[in-house]
């Protein structure tokens, strides 16, 4: 019995949930000074990085052609699905932590640590790679004099290291780390200036493109493309068409447009940094959803406009993949405009760098405050900024940018981001089908009808960790759900969400690695495809039939459960597309994370310590009560440990520092 009890106790530690109360919201040590406009600027600056100056040309030439505008539309719709899930959690749980916190309060501590640990990796690599890109852009403007100097005197000939140490990237990272340590208000002001310049440059590109553009560039015939290929002595493609496609608006067909959309999806990554500002916004319940949705809309309009202008200015097949906009302006006779584009590119890289550095210390701060990482990272300065986490993040990112060649590591950013998107969407599904939520105390009391009251369970005012709610469901809940959510319906939905993720993973692997078998109509592949599709549809429809919680918050995801389910599908499919080398590196990073968690985090978890204190108090109380009172207290405490805790709905907080 003892080993079984120890195993059960260990399992409870892994799935214990964080409870966020009104008291903990008021206890924030960070400065609440950001406005809705600050969040929009932060989201736009982080998302609308240098990719807008490069990605459009690359995708248009290789995948989509003029239909790149459709690719960006599809990618934007897929990104909005993830954004809406973040927006609902931002309205429900306006605390620092983003996807890490949302996972912690919904599915438990282990998944929360995995999410936070991978977000740390994503932001570190993102910060370092953007800093090196900023340094490279500056070097291009100076005719590559900086790079030539360091190659001559500081060249590094070691596998895995950069060609030369990038002092410019280090100085930039440390400068921004100092700015972020000084205060969030000052950082937001600098971000708004750079974002405004970036938007103005992109507006100039759009206007110039529509003025100098030619609609004929979208109506290029297939015969014309074949003649060009023949004159260049380039062999035709496998289907006999030109290597530049069949011409027209979709030269590579709708499959090419979809392939372009998969690439363009990553252009919208970055809005999640808004969700880390929950304790620094004056009105988080409204500001965070508005900031996320508006920033994605602005970014889509920018990507749509720039890509449309670019494919009007010059034929898609002659676009330059590395510097499409400067080459396009030279093509139409506006060569000096490339300096305007260069200035906008530097501003875009600056805001993108700030957007990567801003959430990183806040994830470190949130995990350290909960005890899952080292406590010194939770120190706050007199200006109410997470200074220890900010400086630590800056030093780590600076070392990465200084020494390493990050090209091989960039794909690892995608794992952390896509995993976070998937978990947040799954958490929204689980959350919305839970029994009634209250503001501070246990939200579901199954003993109420039997005992007449659950006052003894609700008497404690402080937050409690929740472990091992009563799982299990009946066939009646499956085939004939009740009108209101119950413990059984909530357990059923939680199980089905996990099963749906498993089915989507299998479907993604099949359509990725068995696509040729499906194309050849092989029986086994078609049978598996039909099985996965039927089961996915059945699971989603079963979830749809379950009763939802009717409590309202400032923002709620529409079209439940279809929208979050489709978001999970998109994210898992994109994760499966990553290379085996990327997953091997990811496994090494996760092994390091599990070492830290099981050696330090699981023993220092604030939620675990709170639970131990509560158990000690209950033991002392039980020793001094009568036998009848002792029995009643044990029953109440048993319920308190079993009830399913979920995020609270907070009153709006609008006070300013």
Curated annotation (Swiss-Prot):
**InterPro entries in the cross-refs:** AA/rel_permease1, Cat_AA_permease, CAT_C
What catalytic reaction does the record list? L-arginine(in) = L-arginine(out); L-lysine(in) = L-lysine(out); L-ornithine(in) = L-ornithine(out); L-homoarginine(in) = L-homoarginine(out)
Gene Ontology molecular function: any one: L-ornithine transmembrane transporter activity
Please name every pair of cysteines joined by a disulfide bond in this record: none
Transmembrane ranges? 39-59, 67-87, 105-125, 164-184, 193-213, 249-269, 290-310, 340-360, 386-406, 410-430, 490-510, 524-544, 555-575, 582-602
Principal localisation:
membrane
One GO BP? L-arginine transmembrane transport
**Pfam families in the record:** AA_permease_2, AA_permease_C
* Residues annotated with Phosphoserine modification: 24, 463, 645
Q: Which UniProt keywords apply?
A: Amino-acid transport, Cell membrane, Glycoprotein, Membrane, Phosphoprotein, Transmembrane, Transmembrane helix, Transport
Does Membrane show up as a keyword for this record?
A: yes
Taxonomy, superkingdom: Eukaryota
Bilayer disposition of the protein? Multi-pass membrane protein
* Topology feature Extracellular, residues: 60-66, 126-163, 214-248, 311-339, 407-409, 511-523, 576-581
A GO cellular component annotation here is:
plasma membrane
Q: Which residues lie on this side of the membrane: Cytoplasmic?
A: 1-38, 88-104, 185-192, 270-289, 361-385, 431-489, 545-554, 603-657
Q: Which residues are glycosylated?
A: 157, 227, 239
Query: Where does this polypeptide localize?
Result: Cell membrane
Q: Which NCBIfam families does the entry mention? A: 2A0303
Q: Which PANTHER family match?
A: CATIONIC AMINO ACID TRANSPORTER 2, INNER MEMBRANE TRANSPORTER YGJI-RELATED
Q: Identify its protein family.
A: Belongs to the amino acid-polyamine-organocation (APC) superfamily. Cationic amino acid transporter (CAT) (TC 2.A.3.3) family.
Purpose: Functions as a permease involved in the transport of the cationic amino acids (L-arginine, L-lysine, L-ornithine and L-homoarginine). May play a role in classical or alternative activation of macrophages via its role in arginine transport.
**Record-given protein name:** Cationic amino acid transporter 2
Q: What is the lineage of its organism?
A: Eukaryota, Metazoa, Chordata, Craniata, Vertebrata
């Amino acid at each position: 019995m003892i080993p079984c009890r120890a195993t059960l106790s260990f399992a409870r530690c892994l799935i214990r949930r964080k409870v966020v109360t009104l008291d903990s919201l008021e206890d924030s040590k960070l400065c609440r000074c950001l406005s809705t406009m600050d969040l929009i600027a932060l989201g736009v600056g982080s998302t609308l990085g240098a990719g807008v100056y490069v990605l459009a040309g690359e995708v248009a030439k290789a995948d989509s052609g003029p239909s790149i505008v459709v690719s960006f539309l599809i990618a934007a719709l897929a990104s909005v699905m993830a954004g809406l899930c973040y927006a609902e959690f931002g309205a429900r749980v306006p605390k620092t932590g983003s996807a890490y916190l949302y996972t912690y309060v919904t599915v438990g501590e282990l998944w929360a640590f995995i999410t936070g640990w991978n977000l740390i990796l994503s932001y570190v690599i993102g910060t370092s790679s953007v800093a090196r890109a900023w340094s490279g852009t500056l070097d291009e403007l100076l005719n590559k004099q900086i790079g030539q100097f360091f190659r001559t005197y500081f060249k590094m000939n070691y596998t895995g290291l950069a060609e030369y140490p990038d002092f410019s990237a280090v100085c930039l990272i440390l400068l921004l780390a100092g700015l972020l340590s000084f205060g969030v208000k000052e950082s937001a002001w600098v971000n708004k200036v750079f974002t405004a310049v970036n938007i103005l440059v992109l507006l100039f590109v759009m206007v110039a493109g529509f003025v100098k553009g030619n609609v004929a560039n979208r109506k290029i015939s297939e015969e014309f493309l074949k003649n060009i290929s023949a004159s260049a002595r380039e062999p035709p493609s496998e289907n006999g068409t030109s290597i530049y496609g069949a011409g027209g608006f979709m030269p590579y067909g709708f499959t090419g447009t979809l392939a372009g959309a998969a690439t363009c999806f990553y252009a919208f990554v970055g809005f999640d940094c808004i969700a880390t500002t929950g304790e620094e916004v004056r009105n988080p319940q409204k500001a965070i959803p508005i900031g996320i949705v508006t920033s994605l809309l602005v970014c889509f309009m920018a990507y749509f406009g720039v890509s449309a202008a670019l494919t009007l200015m010059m034929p898609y097949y002659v676009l330059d993949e590395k510097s499409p906009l400067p080459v396009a302006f030279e093509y139409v006779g506006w060569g000096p405009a490339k300096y305007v584009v260069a200035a906008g590119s530097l501003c875009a890289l600056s805001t993108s760098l700030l957007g990567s550095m801003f959430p990183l210390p806040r994830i470190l701060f949130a995990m350290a405050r909960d005890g899952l990482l080292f406590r010194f990272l939770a120190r706050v300065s007199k200006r109410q900024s997470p200074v220890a986490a900010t400086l630590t993040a800056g030093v780590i990112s600076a070392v990465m940018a200084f020494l390493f060649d990050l090209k091989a590591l960039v794909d690892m950013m995608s794992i952390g981001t896509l995993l976070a998107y998937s978990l947040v969407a799954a958490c929204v599904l689980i959350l919305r089908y839970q029994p009634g939520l209250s503001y501070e105390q246990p939200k579901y009391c199954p003993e109420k009808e039997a005992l007449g009251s659950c006052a003894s369970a609700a008497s404690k005012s402080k937050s409690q960790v929740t472990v091992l709610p009563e799982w299990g469901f009946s066939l009646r809940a499956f085939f004939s759900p009740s009108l209101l959510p119950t413990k059984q319906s909530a357990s059923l939905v939680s199980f089905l969400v996990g099963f749906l993720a498993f089915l989507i993973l299998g479907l993604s692997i099949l359509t990725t690695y068995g696509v040729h078998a499906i194309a050849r109509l092989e029986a086994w592949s078609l049978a598996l495809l039909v099985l996965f599709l039927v089961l996915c549809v059945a699971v989603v429809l079963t979830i749809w039939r379950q009763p939802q919680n009717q409590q309202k918050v400032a923002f709620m995801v529409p079209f439940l459960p279809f929208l979050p389910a489709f978001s999970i599908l998109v994210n898992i499919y994109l994760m499966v597309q990553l290379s085996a080398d990327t997953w091997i590196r990811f496994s090494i990073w996760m092994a390091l994370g599990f070492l830290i968690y099981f050696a330090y985090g699981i023993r220092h978890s604030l939620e675990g310590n709170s639970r131990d204190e509560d158990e000690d108090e209950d033991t002392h109380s039980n020793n001094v009560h009568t036998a009848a009172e002792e029995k009643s207290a044990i029953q109440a405490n048993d319920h308190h440990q079993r009830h399913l805790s979920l995020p609270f709905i907070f009153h709006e907080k609008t006070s300013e520092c």
